[in-house]
Amino acid sequence: QAFQDMYLEVPEEGFHNEISGGFEIRKAQLSDVEEMVVLEKRISGIERAKDFKYFIENKRGIWNTLVCRDTNGTLLGFLGSVDHPASQMIGPGVGESEKVALCMLASLLDRFRGKCPVFLFPVTAKEAVQTAYSWGARNCEIHFSQCLGKNQPPKGIVMPTFMPETG
């Protein structure tokens, strides 16, 4: 799968482009990890509970992870980010749809006030990519995923990253 690496300069006053979807977006908790693992396994075929716990525990104070649920409480996606002087990046995450991914991205972008984080969308996520462009995002690179063994095509939106991942 090919991914568009994009960056967006977030204004000092914040990012205020919310996507309406009737979703609840909140900070992830350790109690969400099991559902996050199940969702990512279904969407992308990998499991990394250890990473999710590390991000949510946030002992270094640089990680932020959100979950997105529907009105029934079903987990539809999650998205993490790192905000450190050496790396300002959004991901990893997965979403059931482009709309879910965009809602989580919009929420995380506001936490990067006055900064310029990088995030990745699959090149096939046309609505998400076009929406990011409309917000002022720009391309910086293209990346390709690879795997050993049999490939499992994603069953949703995957937003990878270059952070410490065990997947």
Predicted regions and their residues:
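Amide-forming acyltransferase catalytic core, primarily the GNAT-like/NAT-type
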Residues: 1-89, 99
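Active-site/acyl-donor-binding loops of N-acyltransferases
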Residues: 1-16, 82, 92-94, 118-167
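A structural signal for short coil/turn segments at secondary-structure junctions
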Residues: 59, 112-113
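Short active-site oxyanion
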Residues: 24, 114-118
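Residue-level signal for alpha-helical context at structural boundaries
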Residues: 54-58, 108, 123-126
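Conserved acetyl-CoA-binding loop-helix of GNAT-fold acetyltransferases
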Residues: 97-110, 130
